């Protein structure tokens, strides 16, 4: 059973997050291992496994990029284990330049420049994310896979920049 079916939701990117949260809470109550403490060992094991599946489904569906990757997996694209990489040389060069810029910001401990950098990366991410949403709506799975690969780069870059921000603020 796929995660969308488990939560009683349609298998699409745009989700009712409130319905997702409510269904998660319902499933957690229904399959919580403590409810099966007096049951047989097999029932206890099944409850633990079901609870783990529910938690994994929740984590996957609540995070937009993970949800997109999961949707791709349902359409035959396993980005988690694939050997395909981004082939867009201009994009890769841009990523290298952004990484170098982030390194320079770190060396200079320039908080103002870092703030501007984070905003720029967020805008780049948001633009690509919107493109991905359109591609998902059109079910152009190859294009979605390519965009998700690029979003991964931007997500890691954003995370690195935010970690640097925390580091600089701690001084």
From Swiss-Prot:
According to the UniProt record, one GO cellular component term is: iron-sulfur cluster transfer complex
Q: What does this protein do?
A: Co-chaperone involved in the maturation of iron-sulfur cluster-containing proteins. Seems to help targeting proteins to be folded toward HscA.
SMART domains linked: DnaJ
Q: Which UniProt keywords apply?
A: Chaperone
Could you give the subunit structure recorded for this chain? Interacts with HscA and stimulates its ATPase activity. Interacts with IscU.
Pfam families recorded for this chain? HSCB_C
Tell me which residues make up the J domain.
2-74
What is the official name of this protein in its record?
Co-chaperone protein HscB
> What is the similarity comment for this entry?
Belongs to the HscB family.
Q: What broad taxonomic lineage does this protein's source fall under?
A: Bacteria, Pseudomonadati, Pseudomonadota, Gammaproteobacteria, Enterobacterales
Q: Name one GO molecular function term.
A: ATPase activator activity
Q: What's the source species for this entry?
A: Shigella dysenteriae serotype 1 (strain Sd197)
């Amino acid at each position: 059973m796929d995660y969308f079916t488990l939560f009683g939701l349609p298998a699409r990117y745009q989700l009712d997050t409130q319905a997702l949260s409510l269904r998660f809470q319902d499933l957690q109550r229904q399959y919580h291992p403590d409810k099966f403490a007096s049951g047989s060992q097999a029932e206890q094991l099944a409850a633990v496994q079901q609870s783990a599946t529910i938690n994994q489904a929740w984590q996957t569906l609540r995070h937009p990029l993970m949800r997109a990757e999961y949707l791709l997996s349902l359409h035959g694209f396993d980005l988690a284990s694939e050997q395909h990489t981004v082939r867009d040389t201009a994009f890769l060069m841009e990523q290298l330049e952004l990484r170098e810029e982030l390194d320079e910001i770190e060396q200079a401990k320039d908080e103002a420049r870092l703030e501007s950098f984070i905003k720029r990366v967020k805008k780049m991410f948001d633009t690509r994310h919107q493109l991905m949403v359109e591609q998902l709506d059109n079910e152009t799975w190859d294009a979605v896979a390519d965009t998700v690969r690029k979003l991964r780069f931007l997500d890691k870059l954003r995370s690195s920049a935010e970690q640097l921000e925390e580091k600089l603020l701690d001084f």
